[in-house]
Amino acid sequence: MKPEIHPIYREVVFHDVTSNFKFLTRSTMSTKETTLWEDGREYPLVKVEISSASHPFYTGKHKLVDTSGRIDKFKKRYAR
């Protein structure tokens, strides 16, 4: 492997902000935020909106996320 061309592969904490679930794994993601993990060490923090803890496929719960009223517009347009 060529030196100095590969990203740094390190332990990173991912935080699912939807379900408030955190997990520690290894990644090349870079971030300026850090968090204190359960082992007392500080790790880089990457915030994600959806992970296996909040995705409907994995949780078995179906919920609609309507960010701009698109569902209401659709229902109004095609209402009988």
Swiss-Prot record:
GO process annotations (BP): translation
Disulphide-bonded residues: none
Signal peptide positions on this chain: none
Keywords on record: Ribonucleoprotein, Ribosomal protein
Keyword Ion transport attributed: no
InterPro entries found in the cross-reference section: Ribosomal_bL28/bL31-like_sf, Ribosomal_bL31, Ribosomal_bL31_B, Ribosomal_bL31_sf
Protein name, as recorded: Large ribosomal subunit protein bL31B
SUPFAM superfamilies named in the record: L28p-like
GO molecular function, one term: structural constituent of ribosome
Assembly notes: Part of the 50S ribosomal subunit.
